[in-house]
Design a protein with these regions (language model features):
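N-terminal secretory targeting modules
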Residues: 1-79, 255-257
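Conserved SGNH/GDSL esterase-like catalytic core that processes O-acyl groups on lipids
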Residues: 74-159
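Catalytic His-Asp segment of secreted/periplasmic serine-dependent ester chemistry enzymes
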Residues: 193-257
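Active-site segments of SGNH/GDSL-like serine hydrolases
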Residues: 149-153, 174-203
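Alpha-helical scaffolding within the catalytic cores
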Residues: 64-68, 127-138, 168-174
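Sec-exported extracytoplasmic/periplasmic mature domains
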Residues: 105-109, 139, 143, 151, ...
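Conserved beta-strand segments of alpha/beta enzyme cores
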Residues: 114-116, 183, 213-215
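Charged helix-capping and loop-helix junction motifs
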Residues: 132, 161-171, 199-203
């Protein structure tokens, strides 16, 4: 009898050990699977984070009009041409186009924004632009964006305001035809201080610009009053201080700075 009981106890113990072993093994497998699954999730999240960080590091850090333009084109590069009179040049320092582009170089993480400045000097008037092949010259550069100064000061005393607008419009049409898709930003020539006829020509430009296929950026409000203009304009053209002021005003629109 004792042997029978002892044998039964041994069998129960063995069965219990077997059940415990299988329970333990099943539990270990479950934990292992959960660990592998979590590791997979963590790795996936790390990959997502890594991809996002890489995207952010390559992201476009330019605001304003240019940032919107790059976003709309899904582009990370652009070529810009600044075209105008001697008001876009500065013999004594950096011109306002150079100062604007310098801000882009300092503030952009990855976009390749290249540019050039094409000046027609102080004598060429708007009615000569097509005849002298300037539309062709711009087209050769194949810009994505053309920043066009109105040449109003060059036209002052040579052409009526309405004629200036007509020639400017024809020039814009010619450029747009040769460079399909180019974005054109039109800016008025700088103020010059006390004058009679010239401000009226700018007024006509302001009135007619909305009818042109351009984005018009009037920066005149950023300039000081006529009696304070001497430090910013000399012989009708911007001084270094004037170029800095113009660059600051245009940059607020162009790159949001």
């Amino acid at each position: 009898m004792k042997n029978t009981v002892f044998t039964a106890l041994i069998m129960v113990s063995v069965v219990g050990m077997v059940i415990a072993h299988f329970y333990y093994q099943n539990r270990v497998n479950t934990i292992a699977k959960e660990a592998i699954s979590q590791a997979s999730v963590d790795t996936h999240n790390q990959e997502k984070t890594s991809t996002k960080a890489e995207h952010d590091s390559e992201g476009i850090e330019i605001g304003g009009w240019l940032g919107d333009f790059l976003d709309s084109q899904d582009a990370d590069s652009a070529y810009i041409v600044f075209f105008g009179s001697s008001s876009i040049e500065n013999e004594n320092g950096k011109s306002w186009p150079e100062l604007v582009m310098e801000q882009i170089d300092n503030g952009a993480a990855s976009p390749a924004i290249d540019y050039e400045v094409i000046s027609v000097g102080s004598d060429t008037t708007s009615d000569q632009l097509l005849a002298e092949g300037f539309a062709d010259k711009i087209a050769e550069s194949e810009p994505d964006v053309l920043v066009l100064e109105s040449l109003t000061l060059n036209d002052n005393g040579n052409l009526a305001a309405s004629d200036s607008i007509a020639h400017l419009s024809a020039f814009i049409d010619a450029v747009s035809e040769q460079i399909p898709g180019v974005e054109i930003i039109l800016v008025p020539t700088n103020p010059i201080g006390p004058a009679t006829v010239y401000p009226g020509q700018i007024d006509v430009l302001n009135e007619q610009a909305p009818s042109l296929p351009v984005t018009y950026v009037d920066h005149w409000d950023a300039w000081p009053a006529e009696e304070e203009m001497a430090a910013y304009v000399e012989s009708g053209r911007p001084t270094s201080e004037g170029h800095e002021l113009w660059a600051s005003a245009f940059s607020q629109f162009f790159i949001g700075e």
